[in-house]
């Protein structure tokens, strides 16, 4: 069973990855190929967060799963937007 603290800590990490990726997405939208490495790193952080989430999800209770599902939806949405961006 996942502890509340471990889920909260993980969600904070996801928020960090989400904010970093949003920043890079906005920069890439304006500057195209200025900093491809940072853009790719932000995509990698999203992928890692989604992978780690699957492991944590399996040992979470219903309330924790709901919080993780919401974060997963946000991460997936941004990941898809980044993929579709003509960068």
Please report, for each region that a protein language model flagged, where it lies by residue.
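Aromatic-enriched hydrophobic runs in primary sequence
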Residues: 1-3, 21, 36-37, 71-85
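Short, charged, amphipathic alpha-helical segments
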Residues: 8, 36-47, 65-73
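Amphipathic alpha-helical coiled-coil segments
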Residues: 48-62, 77-87
